[in-house]
């Protein structure tokens, strides 16, 4: 029996070009040590759920299944933090109830579709770099406002991200 083809998928808030530019500026405010790997500007996003490898044959079902109603919300990203293992992130100043409600609704949807949400606690963030060592986080600048009116199902393949479907607010 041959190996089943899979797609590496995640659900995310996907920034528009203007917001992506501001996120890139925030990423570039860090002074990265040698060996750090800043995230390419085209890949900056806020993950809602990482699904991992999913059988590609399930994509039609999942594309429709991930459409859940939600209310738009506003994020204020403005807390640069270095996480363990050299992960540099930009966290929101507060976790909007709308973001947490969307995350919870998508968790329920994952279970209904026979997929398992991650067990670890949800910590919303935008990853700025990996292998950042012990870099000092820059002084917080003005918060970056993110008016979220949609989320996306994204495929990661060979280092490239492709938005498979955008899900606007209800």
Protein language model regions, located:
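Histidine-dependent nucleotide/RNA phosphoesterase domain, centered on the 2H-phosphoesterase fold
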Residues: 1-170
């Amino acid at each position: 029996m041959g190996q089943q083809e899979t797609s590496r998928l995640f659900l995310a808030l996907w920034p528009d070009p203007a917001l992506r530019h501001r996120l890139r500026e925030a990423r570039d405010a860090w002074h990265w040590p040698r060996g750090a790997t800043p995230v390419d500007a085209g890949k900056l996003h806020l993950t809602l759920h990482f699904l991992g490898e999913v059988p590609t044959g399930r994509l039609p079902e999942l594309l429709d299944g991930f459409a859940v109603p939600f209310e738009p919300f506003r994020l204020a990203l403005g807390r640069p933090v270095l996480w363990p293992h050299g992960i540099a992130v930009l966290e929101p100043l507060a976790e909007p109830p709308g973001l947490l409600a969307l995350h919870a609704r998508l968790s329920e949807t994952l279970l209904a579709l026979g997929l398992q949400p991650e067990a670890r606690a949800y910590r919303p963030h935008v990853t700025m770099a990996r292998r950042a060592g012990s870099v000092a986080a820059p002084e917080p600048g003005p918060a970056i406002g993110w008016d979220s009116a949609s989320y996306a199902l994204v495929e990661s393949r060979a280092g490239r991200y492709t938005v498979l479907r955008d899900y606007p607010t209800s």
